[in-house]
């Protein structure tokens, strides 16, 4: 993890300034939706591009992620089995040449879902393992037991507003600096919030090449997330999490783009179970289509290290950008 983040930092140090048309530096606004991790203030995947001066960007995304993990040690038991649907509204406003402000408002639902059978078939088609998916289909059970004491349990469908995030960004030489504060507006008992305020800070860079006479953009970022004293498994929660990511996007035609991105983050909990205590490496692949002022995007996310990332995820999102 340290070596990978160091490589991202090296990339940032030699990045070019963001191009004027931020459409070519777009990314899928993915983040980890592991039920025990999505409550914290990790920003969604972003690039160095800002809204145009005096303009704004509005985005809406729908994420559906599915988990089927369990573990047991001499003194602990963990179960993560269910489906999470997250609908997020994102607004960015360029209020000054050197300042962009933003807000992200999520709505989160945890349920048994309907995708277990489809995911088993998907994994079989790709030659991936289904060894974690030998339990009943479409059930909800998120639980953590330590020394015979149930520290957390959720086994019925819940939903509600998640933790709202306020953000600011500014250009800094060849880079973009982004900071965010996540507020405790969700409910820890429903896993729609952590019950604490988190603060993040990241450095973002991008550069653009030409491939087959079309723009090929590379983006990367590295940052740190400071966690407040949350109410979900507080005995095990860490206070600091590093994160980073890289993305490649090719404008294949005037309206159609292809992209892939890799996001990484450190562990949030000191526990024997990598399912909530391990590092996260998530791969996202997909495409986007420009229809007037709207950019429509579809992405599929898969875990790379089979630990703290959701087992399967897909996202449909749309972005509207307006200049002054």
List the predicted regions and their residue ranges:
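Cleavable N-terminal export/targeting peptides
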Residues: 1-29, 324
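Transmembrane beta-barrel domains of Gram-negative outer membranes and organellar outer membranes
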Residues: 20-192, 199-228, 241-253, 257-300, ...
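Active-site glycine- and acidic-residue-rich loops that bind
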Residues: 196, 235-239
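Short beta-strand-to-coil "C-cap" segments at the C-terminal boundary of structured domains/repeats
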Residues: 318-324
């Amino acid at each position: 993890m340290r070596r990978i983040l160091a490589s991202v930092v090296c990339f940032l140090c030699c990045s070019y300034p963001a191009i004027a048309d931020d459409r070519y530096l777009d990314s899928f606004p993915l983040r980890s939706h592991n039920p025990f991790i999505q409550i914290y203030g990790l920003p969604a995947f972003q690039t160095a591009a800002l809204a145009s001066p005096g303009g704004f960007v509005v985005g809406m995304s729908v994420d559906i992620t599915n988990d089927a993990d369990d573990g047991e040690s001499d003194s602990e038991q963990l179960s993560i089995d269910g489906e999470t649907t997250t609908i997020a509204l994102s607004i960015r406003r360029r209020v000054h040449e050197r300042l962009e402000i933003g807000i992200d408002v999520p709505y989160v639902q945890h349920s048994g879902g309907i995708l277990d059978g489809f995911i088993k078939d998907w994994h079989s088609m790709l030659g991936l393992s289904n060894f974690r998916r030998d339990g009943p289909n479409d059930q909800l059970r998120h639980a953590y037991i330590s020394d015979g004491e149930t520290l957390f349990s959720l086994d019925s469908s819940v939903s509600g507003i998640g933790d709202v995030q306020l953000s600011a960004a500014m250009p800094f030489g060849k880079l973009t600096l982004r900071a965010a504060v996540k507020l405790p507006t969700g409910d820890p008992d429903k896993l729609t919030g952590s019950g604490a305020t988190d603060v993040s800070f990241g450095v973002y860079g991008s550069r653009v090449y030409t491939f087959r006479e079309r723009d090929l953009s590379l983006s990367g970022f590295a940052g740190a997330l400071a966690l407040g004293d949350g109410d979900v498994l507080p005995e095990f929660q860490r206070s600091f999490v590093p994160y980073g990511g890289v993305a490649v996007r090719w404008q294949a035609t005037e309206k159609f783009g292809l992209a892939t991105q890799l996001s990484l983050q450190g562990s949030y909990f000191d526990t024997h179970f990598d399912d909530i205590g391990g590092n996260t490496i998530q791969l996202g692949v997909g495409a986007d289509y420009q229809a007037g002022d709207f950019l429509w995007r579809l992405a599929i996310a898969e875990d790379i290290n089979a630990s703290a990332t959701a087992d399967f995820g897909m996202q449909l999102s749309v972005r509207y950008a307006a200049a002054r």
